Swiss-Prot record:
Matches recorded under InterPro entries: 4pyrrol_synth_GluRdtase, 4pyrrol_synth_GluRdtase_dimer, 4pyrrol_synth_GluRdtase_N, GluRdtase_dimer_dom_sf, GluRdtase_N_sf, NAD(P)-bd_dom_sf, Shikm_DH/Glu-tRNA_Rdtase
Protein name (record): Glutamyl-tRNA reductase
Gene Ontology terms for molecular function: glutamyl-tRNA reductase activity; NADP binding
Native source species: Chloroflexus aurantiacus (strain ATCC 29364 / DSM 637 / Y-400-fl)
Keywords of the record: Chlorophyll biosynthesis, NADP, Oxidoreductase, Porphyrin biosynthesis
EC number: 1.2.1.70
HAMAP family (UniProt xref): Glu_tRNA_reductase
Pfam families linked to this entry: GlutR_dimer (PF00745), GlutR_N (PF05201), Shikimate_DH (PF01488)
Chain's gene name: hemA
Primary role: Catalyzes the NADPH-dependent reduction of glutamyl-tRNA(Glu) to glutamate 1-semialdehyde (GSA).
Length: 434
């Protein structure tokens, strides 16, 4: 078995491809089961699996079974998403072994994010791990890897300043609106969605002076809670056309699998604005739409409407590129922390080499203990239960004390890359089948 990663992110694939391979929350159980189950009678691709799917990345982490290749994973992605492999294979990256651990630790630390040091990825990594754990596709190796990666993210944020003042995708979207339109006071802002991205957008809009905020979401309770928290107006999802008609700025971030805003929606909104101005010869009204969702919420051809300016998450680079320079001074420290966590994982992995021999040694010791204990008890008559318990405890204590030094020695040797050598010596000394 081998640690394996196949993925794509904002550096290798545009949003048009990322959205095609994104896994929704409803997709995850089926996808993870297909990766780790053997319903067809053939061995599954992975013994363990976690899928990390966000607006900027889709990554499959796994412990492969013998015979699994990168092509098998490409074929899985193509079949699951019903897309020809040729349309996306050139955007994929593949890592094995140590490189997987290094990539995940850096990802959890925000070092591979579009917005350098952003904190949301930490929660997204945790959510991906917990979702796989609930489904039962996490074993000991991915459990340890993700726990160590989450520690890496936490340490980087606590031991460096990389996260201080770090933007989020939401903040970058608001900054884009501010740069394009200037003062946000008096602007009609429509937020579509009720999740974390929308909440962060609301926070940043208010911080930047926005004072006319409307929130629309399919789940009215979520929208109502956000609206109350930030002093916004809440509208039912069915009122989206009316909300668009009065909006100057639209920021959308739902989990819809297909667009919720099409060209005719925006065209009608622009026409309504034009009529309201009672100026048939004036330039068309402007509308700024920022689509932070993957898959996208807003159809791409909306951008063809005069007066409409449509941006996606990929367009945020112009806003956040300066953060790389601003935070490059602490990158070296962050990368050092990541490397320390990677080495901790690798050390743990090496200790796993010792487990088979240690298990056999413990089993052999138990066999001898049980044989000798039974022989002794047969020779001792009329023992009370308390006396038998004392002798039983004595035998266990002797075995544990005798096994502790070689066990500790082998684990330490394995942690330093000498596990196979010491395991072979131990197996020969104790006549173990190894």
């Amino acid at each position: 078995m081998n640690l394996f990663l196949a993925g794509l992110d904002h550096t290798t694939a545009p949003v048009e491809i990322r959205e095609q391979l994104a896994f929704s929350q409803t997709d995850l159980p089926s996808a993870l089961m297909q990766l780790t189950s053997s319903e067809t009678g053939t061995p599954p691709l992975f013994a363990e699996a976690v899928i990390l799917s966000t607006c900027n990345r889709v990554e499959l982490y796994g412990v492969t079974n013998p015979g699994t290749t990168a092509q098998h994973v490409v074929d899985f992605l193509a079949a699951f998403h019903r897309r020809p492999a040729a349309s996306f294979v050139h955007t994929l990256y593949f890592y094995q072994g140590e490189a997987v651990a290094r990539h995940l630790c850096a990802t959890a630390a925000g070092l591979r994010s579009l917005v350098l040091g952003e904190a949301q990825i930490q929660g997204q990594v945790r959510n991906a791990y917990e979702a796989a754990q609930r489904i039962g596709s996490v074993g000991s190796i991915l459990h340890r890897l993700f726990q160590i990666a989450l520690v890496a993210g936490k340490r980087v944020r606590h031991e460096t300043t990389i996260g201080k003042g770090a933007a989020s995708v939401s903040q970058a979207g608001v900054e884009l609106a501010r740069r394009r339109l200037g003062d946000l006071r008096g602007r009609e802002v429509l937020l579509i969605g009720g999740g974390e991205v929308s909440e962060l957008a609301a926070q940043n809009l208010i911080a930047n002076g926005a004072d006319r905020l409307t929130i629309v979401n399919r789940t009215s309770a979520r929208a109502a809670a956000l609206a109350e928290r930030y002093g916004a107006e809440m509208l039912d999802f069915g009122a989206l056309p009316q909300a668009l008609a009065r909006a100057d700025i639209v920021i959308s971030s739902t989990a819809a699998p297909v667009p919720i805003i099409y060209r005719h929606h925006v065209a009608e909104a622009i026409a309504h604005k034009q009529r309201a101005r009672a100026c048939g010869e004036c330039d068309p009204p402007t509308m700024l739409l920022i689509d932070l969702a993957v898959p996208r919420d807003i159809a791409a051809d909306v951008a063809q409407i005069p007066g409409v300016h449509l941006f996606t998450v990929d367009d945020l680079r112009e806003v956040v590129s300066h953060t790389i320079e601003l935070r490059s001074a602490v990158l070296e420290i962050a990368q050092q922390i990541v490397e320390e966590q990677v080495q901790e994982f690798l050390s743990w992995m090496r200790t796993q080499e010792a487990l088979p021999v240690l298990t056999m040694l413990r089993q052999r010791a138990e066999e001898v203990r049980n044989e000798e204990l039974a022989r002794a008890l047969r020779r001792l008559h009329d023992l009370s239960p308390e006396q038998r318990a004392v002798i039983e405890g004595l035998s266990r204590s002797i075995v544990n004390k005798l096994l502790h030094p070689p066990t500790r020695c082998l684990r330490e040797a394995a942690a330093h890359g000498q596990g196979k050598r010491y395991a072979s010596i131990l197996a020969e000394l104790f006549n173990l089948e190894h």
